[in-house]
């Protein structure tokens, strides 16, 4: 099902899961996107035995195992690790405009004003709702730092804390540099604006490189380039696509065979 970040797929999945017609497996972001929905609803099978059989407890990073674990069970098989906090740009266009990739959000805001003065109406390309949430994550990570970013989600830092409020304030100023028609654009169309020279920057995960390289036939490092999103140098904000096994899958054994494949070295190398 089309739709960035699985927005449409999740709606279709909900209909099938609640209607007693679960798919044999489905793609889901590792962590609470699955655990906080279908795992706590007792709709998924525990894959711990499969992980032991395949030796994956030793193969996957411990932090990733922790992310897909809940109440003694392991609930999905990761197939990749993405970096989300990446800023994309075209070196030739930045040279033409006389600016550099900003290293902080303050630098970004100053660069934004410079570019607006040069006639670039919206220096930051932005797409539909989930891409705006994606951007907020990178802004908040920069403002809070890794420790307080984690504290925001484990309950040690409240969203009403002045540090958290400042993240929203910075985010608001960053949005002033973005296109006003963001809600109508896919993430690919937002990337296109950078490629077409209609915007200078786009904050998107490393899958944007796949789009520009494979679909747009651009050469990485030459035609397009990247940097950590402002203020996040040395920090790798990760996310992982994974597959789980719903209870009641009609082709359960085939689904398990699929999970074995995507979790294998051969499967991981092919997928990535």
Q: Model regions: which residues?
A:
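Periplasmic-binding protein-like
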Residues: 119, 261-272
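Glycine-centered hinge/linker elements that transmit conformational signals in sensory
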Residues: 112-115, 153-184
